[in-house]
């Protein structure tokens, strides 16, 4: 064999079998940075149609987690695939840099502003801290292979962005959407600030659930309304609440106008009580109160009790019964304790009746000094004291510890309160913002489509947006209000423009350093500067204007796509929609795509306490970023995304199949120069033409899947192609031709041309997902080419040609089915030790007329398809008794060990081996390939 092995076309490539991604990827990143790859991509798309994916900014605090990785990788796949489709798709990553979490971190280092450090110095420390966090996260995102303008990302703390945020607020004000009001807002007593809806989490909490009697000011008159005359016992209306601490702020009792209410007399421990309850809840209440007996004295509709007055159980005033649509009979008594300063529904119904918005609670959750009974007590600690006082006053009918879902601060994980405070709001209804936003939601494509109904419900039910915060590190609400009337300065919009210009030069500190007289002149003494800062959701929510609308690479083109986790319907998607609609009357996006959260193999959230956290840094250091990227792409992101070490190892296995396919392609393109060796598709061997045709069809399917953001379908089709159509069929068949045919002959060059087309296409298919591997393949492909695959478009030379004389795709699919049946019988013969490899087999196929016509069409080349040394086709009717039945009714098989000698060069067993005098160890085919013009292949 030593004489002939040099006549073989052995595969050869520098592309290693093992990716060694963890070590090699950083080297590639270094080259990408050095070569200015992102700018090369930008330059390659000048003048093309823009596609703008706007990056929702992660918060600049802490290391990135697996959820961040999912988000950034999905965005990167989209941007790269859109670029491959010819779009100008810039990607400018961003960070959210203001707000409480950064303040808390800085407080731990330097203390609270105004104590050991001035507010100005504190802001500067916050800016430094945020910049450090951005640097850390940026390095981790780059390591994932995400391409973008990492040198010039947008930061909400950039002076220009801070200024543009102020400018966007001035437009909201100009359009009449801002108002100031005393309203109940989510309030964290630990933060000392209002919270946005998106900053509220719900956790279980145990609270005292109490039934409290409010005695009528005129019991006899109330009883008469129920048809009971001259009633002698006190009559009380009963409320049920889980927030006893709000009772000092009670100003009414809400009932439903349509519900039936009963006057119930019941006996307990020798005393007679008369109470008003919703009729459907009477039995449940009597059981709860431990009534020994009870009797319904009369019923009326709730509407009949409107404005009847009842005494507050421990304060010296009385309150009215009022009608409210928010009253239900799901629990309690059918009567709702109403404190307009401590609840949204309470506030709304209170406005209708002109009730006082009482707020006896300070910023720190402690009752104010003038609060009777409870001054100086923290509200949650006062609950027990309220209960004790009610008991003392004889107003407590029942008391039990009650476990329920309760709002908590997302940062402190502590229970929050509803508290009326003077705040700045964007009104949902004054200028029809709610109606406009709902209309815009309908014009937007939501992926998955359930996102539309989700955000619609949120917009329909959301209160006015409280955009003010009482914090130090944030974009200031740059307003001047009159010291006496609290009215905005009439020139607020133009004043804000002047302030924004200063902030653009000096940052937000310019507002606090500003002497009002510089802008207001003699009016300065009549006005005061607002010291509140903006909700950070306003910062990020306005970036469609402050960033996309301002940076030159976006060309003034609107945003095409927002892509974030499914929690952002109430977060970034919502705030962006509100601000954009308030500013322009339009949504800021055309499409909104959401992905699910990451969970472990058992469906649990990632938690340090459970010990199931998968850190992206560990994955890239161990397996490589391309494995993480493949897992993201292969997972259906519309639901929860399951990740574990086992799942990532499965992704690594899948990756190896793709890598091995790429390696086979490259190794067999050794010595191929497309400039002179490329065979035209119409001149190819039929099987090669089929392979190119299949690749062309697959490319259309892959492009369509990318366009629809169905990346898991891309990976499924890619794996199917690599494993089945290529790996188990085409590549398996062509190995013999590739290795043994004449090096420059048509049979081999046809095959190499097909491999070249497939490799050129496939490197582009995988580039958005397996970016590092695609770059590695691209550098080793033969022929003249640009430096990077990422500047290319989808491969255009996959000509899907079918000649009149060609065998159809269905023909090759049938042949693949036959081949699989033959393989089963050969495998059994190997297990029976009748043969070694398949080339030691002679196979006889007994086939019906239709199948015989197909199998004989390619003549002697059938043996190359079946990977046997001999293949004979005989009529099915002639099947011998030892013929094996197959899953095809039209086919039976016999496999025998060949008696022919083995060709030393190609290992086929042929009768002529030993009969050729010049080459006694070779077959005719090999002699032709080393001395003649090379074998002729037409079909396979």
Curated annotation (Swiss-Prot):
Zn(2+) binds at residues 903, 906, 923, 926. Its EC number is 6.1.1.5. CDD domains: Anticodon_Ia_Ile_BEm, IleRS_core. Catalyzes the attachment of isoleucine to tRNA(Ile). As IleRS can inadvertently accommodate and process structurally similar amino acids such as valine, to avoid such errors it has two additional distinct tRNA(Ile)-dependent editing activities. One activity is designated as 'pretransfer' editing and involves the hydrolysis of activated Val-AMP. The other activity is designated 'posttransfer' editing and involves deacylation of mischarged Val-tRNA(Ile). PANTHER family: ISOLEUCINE--TRNA LIGASE, MITOCHONDRIAL, SOLEUCYL-TRNA SYNTHETASE. ATP binds at residue 608. Keywords: Aminoacyl-tRNA synthetase, ATP-binding, Cytoplasm, Ligase, Metal-binding, Nucleotide-binding, Protein biosynthesis, Zinc. One of its GO terms (molecular function) is tRNA binding. It comes from the Bacteria. It catalyses: tRNA(Ile) + L-isoleucine + ATP = L-isoleucyl-tRNA(Ile) + AMP + diphosphate. A motif ('HIGH' region) lies at residues 58-68. InterPro entries: aa-tRNA-synth_I_CS, aa-tRNA-synth_Ia, Anticodon_Ile_BEm, Ile-tRNA-ligase, Ile-tRNA-ligase_type1, Ile-tRNA_ligase, M/V/L/I-tRNA-synth_anticd-bd, Rossmann-like_a/b/a_fold. Its cofactor is Zn(2+). Belongs to the class-I aminoacyl-tRNA synthetase family. IleS type 1 subfamily. GO terms for cellular component: cytosol. This is Isoleucine--tRNA ligase. Monomer. It is found in: Cytoplasm. The keyword Protein biosynthesis applies. It is an enzyme of class 6 (ligase). A motif ('KMSKS' region) lies at residues 605-609. L-isoleucyl-5'-AMP binds at residue 564. NCBIfam families: ileS.
